Amino acid sequence: MQAKKPIEDLLKELQELYDNPADPVHKDYYSKLALLELCGWLELVIDDIALKYARARIIDPKNVELLEKEIVGKTYGCDYKANFRPMLIKIIGLTNVEQFENKLTTLGVFQILVSQLSSLASLRNPAAHTSIAGVMTTFQAPSTMTNYLNSLHPILTIVESELNAM
């Protein structure tokens, strides 16, 4: 899984800039950047979890290439239902995804994972496809993204561990 410290440090730096902006309008820049950076990091984590699992089990180089280019390589976004789950279904199959989700539910982390990733995706998607210029949009402070990170990181560690245990 991607290291937490670099994104944690970046979010901290963005919060410091947000708290002391050279121009008040820059607060929106730092907030939007924090959101996009956290979601980008989450996409990398999701990809890493899937790739690590699959590479440990797939032997045929053609299937590894298919995995990297067509399954993981064409998955964009950090939403569980729209991005991560379909990728897992292609890699481990629907019945195994069901077992995996049941295990995460038993551990009490599945609904939190789905809810937080969905929440972030609903913030990220419009932010990623619009410009701040001339638009009155407000974004949550970088500290909010740090809270998401601190909540999701241990859950993603469990996700990785439970997936690799299958």
Q: What is the meaning of each model-derived region?
A:
Residues 1, 25-36, 107, 111-118, ...:
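Short, solvent-exposed segments of well-ordered alpha helices
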Residues 1-32:
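Charged alpha-helical initiation segments
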Residues 6, 10-13, 37, 41, ...:
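Amphipathic, well-ordered alpha-helical segments in soluble domains
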Residues 14-24, 127, 131-134, 163-166:
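Secondary-structure edge/capping motif, primarily at the C-terminal ends of alpha-helices
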Residues 28-53:
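Short, hydrophobic, well-ordered secondary-structure elements
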Residues 46, 50, 54, 132, ...:
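Hydrophobic/aromatic-lined pockets within catalytic cores
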Residues 57-135:
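Flexible secondary-structure boundary motifs
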Residues 111-126, 138-166:
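Amphipathic, Lys/Arg-enriched alpha-helical patches that create a basic surface
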